[in-house]
Amino acid sequence: MSSIEERVKKIVAEQLGVKEEEVKNEASFVEDLGADSLDTVELVMALEEEFETEIPDEEAEKITTVQLAIDYINANLA
């Protein structure tokens, strides 16, 4: 089983159509990886599906970087 970090990065790369090497922890979905608002919604849905969790809208709005997504999943899967 790959780590949460690896799984999040793979999902981000697939959802945003970028290479996994471009998906750095500090990367912003919008500013660095070219996501728009629809992309970010679809990204959150993909994370919810992968990790079998529900991310409330008010929390999803705060997840703007790869690291924030990793941190959220780590904190809420325990």
Curated annotation (Swiss-Prot):
MF terms in GO: acyl binding; acyl carrier activity
Positions of modified residues (O-(pantetheine 4'-phosphoryl)serine): 37
Domain of life: Bacteria
Record InterPro entries: ACP (IPR003231), ACP-like_sf (IPR036736), PP-bd_ACP (IPR009081), Ppantetheine_attach_site (IPR006162)
Compartments, record wording: Cytoplasm
Pathway: Lipid metabolism; fatty acid biosynthesis
Gene Ontology cellular-component terms listed: cytosol; membrane
UniProt keyword list: Cytoplasm, Fatty acid biosynthesis, Fatty acid metabolism, Lipid biosynthesis, Lipid metabolism, Phosphopantetheine, Phosphoprotein
Chief subcellular location: cytoplasm
Any one Gene Ontology BP term: lipid A biosynthetic process
Family of the protein in this entry: Belongs to the acyl carrier protein (ACP) family.
Xref: NCBIfam families: acyl_carrier (TIGR00517), PRK00982.1-2 (NF002148), PRK00982.1-3 (NF002149), PRK00982.1-4 (NF002150), PRK00982.1-5 (NF002151)
Function description: Carrier of the growing fatty acid chain in fatty acid biosynthesis.
Record PANTHER family: ACYL CARRIER PROTEIN, CARRIER DOMAIN-CONTAINING PROTEIN
Protein name according to UniProt: Acyl carrier protein
Organism listed in the record: Cellvibrio japonicus (strain Ueda107)
